Amino acid sequence: MILVIDVGNTNIVLGVYDEQTLLQHWRIATDRTRTTDEYGMLVKALFRDAELNVEDIEGIVLSSVVPPVVFPLENMCVRYFNRRPFVIGPGIKTGLDLKVDNPREVGADRIVNAVAATVKYDGPLIIVDFGTATTYCYIDAQKRYYGGIISPGVMVSTEALYNKAAKLPRIEIAKPQSTIGRNTVHAMQSGTYFGYVAQVDGLVHRMKEEMGEATVIATGGLARLISEESATIKIVDPFLTLDGLRIIYERNK
């Protein structure tokens, strides 16, 4: 079995694979102040609750967009799993041809998603990942990665509105029953939800105008909710990043 760890700005997602089967997955908060032992005790508790043994883990792969968290997690893997993790970074085997100005600038999460998508689906592909930032990536049928778009994430936008507008409340992200809101919360939910649906469809349309038709895959925490009204999202794959980590680990063994 292998343990995959995806560190995002808001959450850390962990998964355990037995060959190609995802046995269990968890989502915990990204905390830059946690120590090696705090992460270790937390992950051991998750394993214990799922009736999994840390001794059965034969390999670990780690991807992070939060550099300060890498060191304690690497140490956690060594101390609690007796395994040094394979860390996603420049120079690894991905099978992608990066057609961007500076390949080292491309986030590990975007590379991992692209690897998984090119294995699981026929290209050309557009990947929309709803995280702290919402990212869009274009990959052609020959697995050439042409870059994409980065925009503020849904939660970042709503928190900014709450923090900067004195009389506006913090809201739950939800799909409202109508576009026109009859109260403040409803109006904010409409602007957030339908605004992001429009953003996705508008940006995907522009990407297709530049690059040609492509299958649109959505992943990330709000992918399924946004896809309910999106005219362009065709596939929702909640485990795209975890699958990508597994695939990259296998290619680099």
Curated annotation (Swiss-Prot):
GO CC terms of this entry: cytoplasm
GO biological process, one term: coenzyme A biosynthetic process
Main location: cytoplasm
Keyword Disulfide bond set for record: no
EC assignment: 2.7.1.33
GO MF annotations in UniProt: ATP binding; metal ion binding; pantothenate kinase activity
Record note on quaternary structure: Homodimer.
Protein's recorded name: Type III pantothenate kinase
Originating gene: coaX
